[in-house]
Amino acid sequence: MPIRLGINGFGRIGRMALRASLNIDGVQVVAINDPFTDCEYMEYMLKYDTVHGRFDGTIAHSEDSITVNGNKISVFKSMKPEEIPWGKTQVDIVLECTGRFTTKKDAELHITGGCKRVIISAPSADAPMFVCGCNLETYDPSTMKVISNASCTTNCLAPLAMVVNKKFGIKEGLMTTVHAVTATQLPVDGPSKKDWRGGRSCGANVIPSSTGAAKAVGKVLPALNGKLTGMAFRVPVPDVSVVDLTCTLEKDATYDEICAEIKRGSENELKGIMTYTNEDVVSSDFLSTTSTCNFDSKAGIMLNSRFVKLVAWYDNEFGYANKLVELAKYVGSKGCQ
């Protein structure tokens, strides 16, 4: 029996999670909750996508459901997580994709509606964070009802940092993510009390921004806790971002040795999560890529044997959503009683 998934919030990540689930064996989306979108519009938004292209499959809708590739998906319209009737469709795991309910207290309200586990598609202040390939072995099904899939940037940075740290040791590091625009940004200048620069036009500016992605690596990989921090630049591209990790190593190494170790990891324990390329790639070459850390050996540089800059690309929409569903599959495999 497949793991039965519910999606709360049919925005960018919610829709990408549904698309991703269709290519991952052992999972099935059976319910979606979005109080702001009717079924006809859901069909339209899933069918047409400016970034990832037209949906390659069949979609239909009724008053209270959409049918994707012959599979009927119930649609609910509740504003409050505790009122969503997940139990009606025997949902095992809810993917919390609204960006609103990111604490354990808020996210676990879904369990009141009848689901058994919740995975938050964003960083969380208090829920345990997991990154595929890095720390799934620490998941405890008996105590962890609500977990987080961390951020798209952490899903790129953590595998890269883990491989380098295991072999060469990371003494300290700074990360910069050059990040695609997201739905929270504004197309023209507007008010943004929390972040004045964030209120400037996303289509006409490179915008410096804060990010907790590097610090979050320390929660996923305790050996790196306190050793990494970072910032972001938001740039006018619709999807695909890139991480620049500049770090001081504990051991001497050549750039070729570091690249060789990353390549080894991409072909072994991180296969499907990390890839390695030595070609002259640009951001659009990684659109709809399912791996979340795509190392670019030609883009990195080294100053000396202990100071290096490493570069990795990631599809911050589809790649992240793919690992969100993969995490749900893993959680389901450990039991959802």
UniProtKB/Swiss-Prot annotation:
Residues the UniProt record annotates as site (Activates thiol group during catalysis): 179
GO MF assignments: glyceraldehyde-3-phosphate dehydrogenase (NAD+) (phosphorylating) activity; NAD binding; NADP binding
SMART domains noted in UniProt: Gp_dh_N
Sequence positions that bind D-glyceraldehyde 3-phosphate: 151-153, 182, 211-212, 234
GO cellular component, one term: cytosol
EC number(s) from the headed UniProt entry: 1.2.1.12
Coiled coil (UniProt feature): none
Record's subcellular location: Cytoplasm
Enzyme class (EC, first level): oxidoreductase
SUBUNIT field: Homotetramer.
Family indicated by similarity: Belongs to the glyceraldehyde-3-phosphate dehydrogenase family.
Protein name, per record: Glyceraldehyde-3-phosphate dehydrogenase 1
